[in-house]
Amino acid sequence: MKSRETLIRLKKFQVDEKRRRVAQIEGMIADFQRMSVDLEREIQTEQERAGINDPSHFAYPTYAKAAIQRRENLTRSADELRIQLEDAKSLLGEAFDELKKVELLDERDQARERAEENAREQADLDSIGLMRARLGVA
């Protein structure tokens, strides 16, 4: 029984770790998206300041070109993180399923132990009743 409790605690810990990993990846994606939006605003501001909106124009601001590159890198990184997020969610689901299996086994064992205990108690009560009946005690 003790090993089953330890196993349940281990599975709960694993589920918590997977949840933290999912939350961490989601946070990183949100940060990248926020930074990308900030860069887009900076690009727009720089384009308005220079009066040039075409990145291929020879006088296009260097800062805007660099910001576009950073924004693209952030977008690419966020896309890669989304793939990792799907994998992490899948692992979380598997860990949760494993936890549920162990918990169900534990519940089944506890129910069986309760039934055995009830059967022993009933047998004891039956033997007491039988002895009283043999002795003629009412």
What are these regions (language model features)?
Residues 1-138:
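Charge-rich amphipathic alpha-helical interaction elements
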